[in-house]
């Protein structure tokens, strides 16, 4: 038996789910913060973007943040210095999911999902997460900045 995620379209066995995959990623990242955790800022944003976990404004802001990480090579510490701390998981003092969601979400076709992330070793993992982030940017190029 297989099932398709209603949000990102990932095809997974019936006893697996995107949430379960995400929990596995988080466990690896927290156990190995310097290796697997090197892409933590991307993993969380990618998962939330693909599962429509943010309100519209935060969704667009999070995608812009991913673009700065991936295309401009901005590091998470630098991003925090720029005052984008409301997307930093340590500073969630206001709701990031409250309010109108991205109306265009259902029209996005995702070319990669969390089901494509291999957990074999840190090199493969970080590579796959980075590819995932890049695919999210190109899959949503038509949306407003
Ligand atoms: Zn999913």
Residue ranges and their predicted role:
Residues 1-145:
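Intrinsically disordered, low-complexity linkers and terminal regions
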